[in-house]
């Protein structure tokens, strides 16, 4: 278990992130496939007849405990991660957009995208419980620590691939106004999944000179996995399976776009706004080792659960073996067990407005608001984010400086550039380097239109 928790932390620290991917470039005046991933209606605003996406890549991490200086210092990451009383929250999110193509025909825009996703999360984990599992000790003395949480504490990871069909249509185009609608139809290819969670955990951790046990406790526990993520969590190659289970899910995005045109400049606008609802769908994992099992934990009297037995666990299968150990039969009862594993995507509302201030100067405001409770064990996770992005935009060059806030790591600031079809940026490079920022990210890509 120690290695599982640290694997999430180290993978996230090596592959660092902000939840709002491609911030700045996805609302660029240039438009195209990246803008359509943000809002499918934007595909009708393509500035070229054809667009080819070679690759786009975004990798990012946000957390509420570890700063960039912590990761580069000689201090023990475990100690920093479980320091204080606030629950530990960490989000890793990686997106790969592979070869993709889009074209315009009359009032229509069409696109075909290939993509792959990795998410790994630590959600609302009690710091003292995490310290006990990770370190195997709360101190060298005899201590008792109360645990009381109404949250669903989770360790969770998901990989999957997608093939997306994009359709947009212009439904109004006057000298001053333009309105588009669109949809993304996404075929989902589950890769691998793992979840270990404990909801409504109440009890007492007892440390008897390094022997940690849980007494007088109750909780609802879920363990579920599919594919290679049932195996060693510290093996990063297990996070590379994206299309292994074929088409076993569907999702949809819906979008609306309004543009106040600039009558004196056909290549620009005064205002561009959009509203999209994303991730309406779910996927079903169908690997041979599928498991979705729920337990009821009830410990009273002289009974206890030995926490030390989780210390060196490296896989979900090992955790399941401990939970099913006859020695724990009196305190852990199976309430349901199934091979069915259906995981929902986190539905998000995306709203943005891009205002032209003067000639080539713009400012964009965006809101990404989740409308699903992603603390539930059958959902992948996301987070709310808000950004303000001043931008200079010419035909072949753009520079922008995202200022953002999200619910996990707080305020961030970064910078990005586009030179013809190549772009590179970070939503948080300034805040990460100038202070104890708890978020970092990088994205880049190559695309061209003709």
Region locations from a protein language model:
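Sec-dependent N-terminal signal peptides
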Residues: 4-13
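Subset of outer-membrane beta-barrel
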Residues: 19-450
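Sec/Tat signal peptide C-region and signal peptidase I cleavage site
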Residues: 14-18
């Amino acid at each position: 278990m120690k290695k599982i928790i640290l694997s999430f932390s180290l993978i996230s620290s090596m592959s660092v992130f902000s939840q709002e991917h491609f911030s700045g470039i996805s609302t660029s005046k240039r438009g195209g496939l990246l803008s359509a991933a943000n809002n499918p209606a934007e595909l009708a605003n393509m500035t070229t007849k054809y667009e080819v996406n070679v690759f786009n890549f975004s990798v990012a991490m946000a957390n509420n405990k570890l700063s960039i200086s912590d990761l580069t210092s000689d201090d023990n990451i475990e100690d920093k991660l479980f320091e204080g009383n606030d629950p530990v929250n960490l989000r890793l999110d990686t997106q790969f957009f592979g070869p993709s193509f889009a074209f315009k025909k009359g009032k229509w825009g069409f696109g075909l995208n290939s993509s792959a996703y990795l998410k790994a999360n630590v959600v609302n984990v009690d710091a003292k419980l995490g310290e006990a599992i990770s370190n195997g000790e709360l101190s060298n003395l005899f201590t008792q620590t109360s645990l009381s949480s109404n949250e669903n504490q989770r360790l969770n990871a998901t990989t999957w691939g997608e093939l997306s069909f994009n359709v947009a249509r212009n439904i109004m185009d006057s000298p001053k106004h333009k309105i588009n609608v669109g949809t993304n139809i996404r075929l989902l290819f589950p890769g691998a999944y793992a979840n270990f969670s404990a909801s409504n955990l109440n009890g007492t951790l007892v440390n008897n000179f390094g022997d940690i046990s849980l007494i007088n406790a109750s909780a609802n526990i879920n363990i579920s996995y599919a594919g290679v993520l049932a195996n060693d969590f510290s093996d990063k190659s297990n996070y590379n399976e994206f299309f292994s289970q074929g088409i076993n899910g569907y999702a949809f995005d819906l979008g609306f776009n309004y543009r106040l045109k600039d009558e004196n400049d056909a290549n620009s606008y005064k205002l561009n706004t959009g509203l999209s609802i994303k991730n309406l769908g779910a996927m079903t994992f169908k690997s041979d080792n599928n498991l979705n099992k729920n337990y009821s934990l009830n410990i009273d009297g002289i009974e206890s659960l030995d926490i030390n037995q989780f210390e060196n666990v490296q896989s979900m299968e090992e955790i399941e073996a401990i939970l099913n150990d006859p020695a724990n039969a009196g305190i852990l009862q199976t309430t349901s067990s199934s091979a069915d594993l259906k995981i929902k995507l986190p539905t998000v509302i995306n709203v943005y407005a891009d205002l032209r201030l003067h000639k080539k100067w713009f400012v964009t405001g965006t809101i990404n608001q989740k409308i699903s409770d992603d603390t539930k064990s059958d959902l992948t996770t996301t987070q709310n984010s808000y950004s303000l992005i001043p931008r200079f935009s010419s035909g072949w060059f753009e520079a922008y400086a995202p200022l953002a806030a999200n619910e996990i790591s707080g305020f961030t600031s970064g910078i990005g550039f586009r030179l013809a079809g190549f772009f590179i940026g970070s939503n948080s490079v300034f805040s990460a380097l100038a202070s104890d920022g708890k978020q970092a990210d990088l994205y880049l890509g190559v695309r061209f239109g003709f």
